[in-house]
């Protein structure tokens, strides 16, 4: 009976996938399951086997073995037990990828507690809101970040310093896991603004099984891959697809710690001989705009991205630099990955710019507001059929004649001007094709005549003036249509972004909402 990892081909996946086969990858079952055991302990029999390689922004390389994490996480589980922190209680971890981070995250899950990774660049307000929401018993962080977390009632702030490691060293390296598959394992916060905190997405230990869909068909992980994901493990991509999925399959994963530098990333990709790369769209754009990619030699055979669509110029850069297609992996934190491009599949044609096709076993449709399926090429909302009902993603899309899905922006990124419906994503994609545009964001702003008009925010090294603004308007109008272009153009030094690196159009809309509508 073939295993799902025996081939990356699309036809093989369609012919051999069955949901029950996902359980073949794990020691646990539907009753008893523990993520820490599945990702770490069962792979730790070889003391030298590397679990994670961390490329630090300062140039350091850190290699952590499965045995290192197994021992330290067991000690951390004992450390929690000594403090009276029991199953179901939350343990917040505000650390960059490091031995300490993995020890704490997997140790909390061994204990049966709930691990809560927090982004290390949160300020006091961002930390306070999330801590107030999840109510952890302890928050583990660095000395530099301890002040941001101090003074929160009911939370013990602990610094992961030499004294902490010395205390752990006195504790046993064995721990018997006793969690059920449906016990809570992780809280993960999406990358919203601190003023509008998204609810934590809560994952049980069973979630590691469903995650294999994305691992097998979204990132294309197979035994023997040398994997890398630079996204922070505080976010869904870095946590699920960059950490848990490869480790569960026993694959060494690489990651990035510290302030992001695209040149440092490319250096790590070359030195680690990475064969499978999964990153956010922003990471690829930054590699392109660095102008330094030509200095490196890569060994990548599978490449995927997520977070937001990639513009055409960056797709061309990926093809020229890595020599493999950029495979979109689409989903949301709430529903998981649902549309993929099957990296490594010789029999699957990747359509540049498309979201691909559904993962095996999932039913995905683009629907009108009344719930009926859209015709080919018609824009509607992407929905997933789960547990007897259609689950909305709040993303717009369309399906072409060949069954490929295409993204058309968030539902709130649609701009309706004088009755015309326009996509912010399409306008941004065209603007980014201009050689003098480094970054672009498009939103709808109030207009007394048209209801809304498109306003583009541009980051460019070129001097900003009216002539450049008109050039961009004409550039867009000639490539899209006579009505689909930015009637307003603003130049800015930088665009607001979410902590996950996505352009935060909501902040731009909020700022514009305070201005009175104008005629154009």
Question: Could you tell me what each predicted segment is?
Answer:
Residues 1-64, 68-81, 144, 154, ...:
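N-lobe entry segment of adenylate-forming
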Residues 48-106, 123-128, 204-206:
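Conserved AMP-binding/adenylate-forming core of the ANL superfamily
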Residues 48-50, 171-192, 196-197, 220-226:
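Conserved pre-ATP/AMP-binding loop-to-beta segment of ANL
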Residues 58-59, 138, 144-182:
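ANL superfamily adenylate-forming
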Residues 209-229, 234-275, 290:
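Conserved AMP-binding/adenylation subdomain of ANL enzymes
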Residues 122-125, 129, 139-141, 277, ...:
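AMP-binding/adenylate-forming catalytic core of the ANL superfamily
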Residues 274-279, 288-349, 363:
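Gly/Ser/Thr-rich phosphate-binding loop
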Residues 62-67, 185-210, 336:
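Conserved AMP-binding A3 loop
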